[in-house]
């Protein structure tokens, strides 16, 4: 950059420092989101991907991917707390359309509809909402096997009667035939707090270093401007 009077000031350093701080801020945000999601059921860790062009593109050179490893399994006394012990997602339907989730904390309404905690309908492997033809007095009368077949006890026949298979799909929406469903379990996040904090430290140091560089370069620019003012 050429300043009036013929004095030149290199602005690339300031721009590079600002861009680097923006990138570091985004990386810190991703890590903070993972730390916040540590104790959330069904949360999957986000991983920031830094491209080789990030130095020039800034935050536009960043992207995130989802770590689809299975999280921590914890036993639940609720028969409608269901988890997937493999990769995959439950399919649900709301007014906003079809969504996928790893959060298998379900409930039953008075009509026998299988719902998520936010009242979305849980879909079967045929893409239809699951509805029990018998609403049991005790949720323990509902059984779900490892292939996702939901059955309910019929007190009249004293037998379990199949209702539907839970619709479990992969990241591309393709149906998974052997999803390894576990009834009476909650899957907490696959986040490792130790790994998140370890990865956070160099990013914070890099942010602080770029902030110091920016302040130094900004002070130098102010001196140049001040000298120009004195010269005139």
Could you describe each region identified by the protein language model?
Residues 1-232:
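Amphipathic alpha-helical polymerization modules
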């Amino acid at each position: 950059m050429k300043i009036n009077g013929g004095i030149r000031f290199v602005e690339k350093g300031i721009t590079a420092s600002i861009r680097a701080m923006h990138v570091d801020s985004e990386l810190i945000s991703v890590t903070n989101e993972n730390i916040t999601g540590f104790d959330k059921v069904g949360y999957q860790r986000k991983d920031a991907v830094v491209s080789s062009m990030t130095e020039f593109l800034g935050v536009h050179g960043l992207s995130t991917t989802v770590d689809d490893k299975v999280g921590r399994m914890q036993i639940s006394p609720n028969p409608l707390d269901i988890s997937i012990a493999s990769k995959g997602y439950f399919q649900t339907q709301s007014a906003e359309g079809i969504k996928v989730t790893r959060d298998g904390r379900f409930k039953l309404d008075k009509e026998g509809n299988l719902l998520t905690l936010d009242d979305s309908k849980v879909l079967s492997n045929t893409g239809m909402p699951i509805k029990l033809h018998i609403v049991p007095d005790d949720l323990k009368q509902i059984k779900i096997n490892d292939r996702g077949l939901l059955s309910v006890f019929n007190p009249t026949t004293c037998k379990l009667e199949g209702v539907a298979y839970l619709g479990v799909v992969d990241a591309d929406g393709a149906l998974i035939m052997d999803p390894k469903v576990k009834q009476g379990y909650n899957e907490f996040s696959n986040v490792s707090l130790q790994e998140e904090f370890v990865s956070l430290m160099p990013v914070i140091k890099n942010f602080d270093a770029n902030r110091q560089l920016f302040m130094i370069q900004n002070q130098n620019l102010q001196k140049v401007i001040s000298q120009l003012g004195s010269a005139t």
